[in-house]
């Protein structure tokens, strides 16, 4: 009898483990939502560009999406920008396990291709999630992609903040945080922000958004 070789994909395996571990942890979390935008209770027509820091990925990918109005007729799901690296392979796999799509790209690799794909997805009505300081930092430094996309497509930006009351902070470039089981996590959704299509000084818009995200993060960060 012929034996068939079993194919083992390390990235897929790690992604499945990470996604299920995240689900398990968040099944015990006391989650508090502060929706200043009305996104959850009165979902808007058309997509939004969701922007949050890289070290808040667990809270947003599990906590926010627990309340995401996926059955509302205006929502067509969420896709996440992930790095075209081996770490990005794992993150894309985690997102897939959690029911999200992904677009592979970064400022240094596949940047223009990813922008075209992101624009096409936005125009199809999909909400897009971007961690503007990923995948390599600097921590709490907002890249220009979200601002550029918002101006190009006319689609508003929605800032997401997460506060962990008890978490493990990893020794990574961004002090990636993982909430402890049975702890509390607060997620705040800011009102929508639009970028003037005629604006020529996108740097001031970038700094405005970076400041809002950074100040909220530094106010709620736990010691590393």
List the predicted regions and their residue ranges.
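A short, well-structured juxtamembrane/interface segment
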Residues: 23-47, 65-66
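Conserved beta-strand termini and adjacent loop/short-helix elements that scaffold enzyme active sites
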Residues: 34-36, 83, 105-108, 190-192
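Hydrophobic helix-cap positions at the C-terminus of alpha-helices
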Residues: 42-43, 67, 121, 216
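Catalytic core of membrane glycerolipid acyltransferases/transacylases, capturing the structured
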Residues: 47-108
């Amino acid at each position: 009898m012929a034996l068939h070789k079993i194919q083992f994909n390390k990235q897929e395996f790690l992604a499945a483990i990470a996604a299920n571990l995240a689900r398990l942890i968040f099944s015990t979390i006391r989650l508090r939502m502060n929706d200043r935008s009305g996104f959850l209770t009165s979902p808007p027509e058309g997509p939004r560009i969701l922007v949050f820091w890289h070290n808040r990925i667990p809270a947003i990918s599990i906590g926010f999406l627990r309340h995401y109005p996926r059955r509302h007729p205006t929502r067509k799901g969420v896709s996440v920008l992930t790095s075209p690296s081996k770490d990005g392979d794992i993150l894309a796999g985690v997102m897939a396990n959690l029911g999200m799509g992904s677009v592979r790209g970064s400022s240094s690799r596949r940047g223009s291709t990813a922008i075209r794909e992101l624009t096409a997805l936005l125009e199809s009505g999909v909400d897009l999630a971007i961690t503007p300081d990923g995948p390599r930092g600097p921590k709490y430094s907002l890249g220009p992609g979200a601002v550029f996309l918002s101006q190009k497509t006319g689609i508003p930006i929605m800032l997401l903040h997460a506060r962990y009351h008890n978490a493990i902070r990893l020794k990574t470039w961004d002090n990636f945080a993982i909430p402890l089981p049975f702890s509390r996590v607060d997620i705040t959704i800011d009102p929508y922000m639009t970028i003037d299509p005629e604006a020529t000084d996108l740097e001031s818009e970038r700094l405005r958004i970076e400041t809002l995200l950074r100040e909220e993060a530094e106010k709620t960060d736990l010691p590393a």
